[in-house]
Amino acid sequence: MKKYITSIMLVLLFISCTNNQQKNSTKKNSVIEIGSALMDGTNEMTPIIVGEISNQEIWLKYIKAHNDKNLDIIAEINAEDWEGYTADGSVLKGNKAHIEVLDNWFKSANPKWKVKWMIANAAKNKDGIIEQWLTTGNEYTDVDENGNEIFEHNVHDIQFADGKIKKIYVYKRAKAQESAEFSY
């Protein structure tokens, strides 16, 4: 009886120590749905899947180039058909136009961004092609013309194509302040 119980205990021990690596590795290679989106030109929700993590390094290099005012690196990372959509509704199209706007802005301002988080994601567009996106949370700081500090929370939704930044949507929120009033 003692041997029987010992044998059962050993079998249970071996089962509990079984390597689950094979199960986990097949999950990594499969498509993992992490959400859904109504992509431009579509009429129904499209699954959002895990995107290319390597785009995070491109974004970090891009932000560093902005902080360093390095227009050459920014232009190198931008796709020629780059598009930018700001929180105030402004739209800018083209790598050259983007660099000109930044050059003028950098002459009179010293904007800085700090990346706080990034989520690589992808989804099929209206043509069935997988688009690579990176959604990021960033802190933006600068000083206005009166010397007042500017602080905003920015969310950038960035589309990548062939290792280049093709499109950026910028959303912003002011620094949190406790208030007796609350507005939407």
Task: Give the location of each predicted region.
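Exposed beta-sheet edge and beta->alpha loop/turn motif
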Residues: 133-172
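Low-complexity, intrinsically disordered terminal/linker segments enriched in charged
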Residues: 37, 167-184
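Short, low-complexity N-terminal intrinsically disordered segments enriched in polar/charged residues
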Residues: 18-72, 76
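Short histidine/acidic/glycine/proline-rich micro-motifs that form metal-
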Residues: 49, 88-91, 142
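Sec-dependent signal peptide recognition
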Residues: 2-10
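A solvent-exposed, acidic/Ser-Thr-rich amphipathic alpha-helical stretch
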Residues: 71-124, 130-132
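A short acidic/glycine-rich loop-to-helix N-cap element
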Residues: 46, 145-150, 176-183
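C-terminal motif of bacterial Sec signal peptides marking the signal peptidase cleavage site
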Residues: 13-16
